[in-house]
Swiss-Prot record:
Gene: atpI
Protein name from the UniProt record: ATP synthase subunit a, chloroplastic
Keyword Transmembrane helix: yes
Record-linked Gene3D superfamilies: ATP synthase, F0 complex, subunit A
Organism: Pinus koraiensis (Korean pine)
Matches recorded under CDD domains: ATP-synt_Fo_a_6
Major subcellular site: plastid
Assembly and binders: F-type ATPases have 2 components, CF(1) - the catalytic core - and CF(0) - the membrane proton channel. CF(1) has five subunits: alpha(3), beta(3), gamma(1), delta(1), epsilon(1). CF(0) has four main subunits: a, b, b' and c.
GO-annotated cellular components: chloroplast thylakoid membrane; plasma membrane; proton-transporting ATP synthase complex
Amino acid sequence: MDIVRSPISTLNHIYDISGVEVGQHFYWQIGGFQVHGQVLITSWIVIAVLLGSATIAVRDPQTIPTGGQNFVEYILEFFRDLTRTQIGEEEYGPWVPFIGTMFLFIFVSNWSGALLPWGILKLPQGELAAPTNDINTTVALALLTSVAYFYAGLAKKGLGYFGKYIQPTPILLPINILEDFTKPLSLSFRLFGNILADELVVAVLVSPVPLVVPIPVMFLGLFTSGIQALIFATLAAAYIGESMEGHH
């Protein structure tokens, strides 16, 4: 009888794992619209962490930086180098805050999904998860990037910016227009897919082996999360730089 039960229990366990879900939604009604409340909650937490950390690190700035101020200046220099490389020496300055904010929000959001036990915070329905675990967040970030590179191109070239759509030949007009729509799609789906996949893998591995296997997977998730933030920020800066350049 035990021999018969063993395969059955194994199959039941596999079935339970196959039903693992990440990011069940907690809905709010705002102005007649249904929004994902858990995304707003976790986003506010991430923003509070960033603002609090920055305030503490630079509350007493010194001429010769030490400690937290030194770390913040190192991060700022990293953002300057990243933005300068992608946008160019003459135009990069105003875009450092935008690229830096994008990177920090995505980086902390991704790491919060890997490090913070969101599941212990109970909601009336649904569950908390990293902000970037929701497609609405990644699409919003991608759309902000789209608005930024359209603004950069129009500010630099005026209406002449739209001339790029018929270069090098007007035949490419549909393809060039389509390219501008695929940029935010690729940014949003790449970030969303990687973060969701990481949390699903951890959730599946925690079920059969809760103590040993998930640890290296979590470290891999932390590394991947950082890489995804860097890729998003780099591509955003590259798109902005491309919009201000002449057609190649």
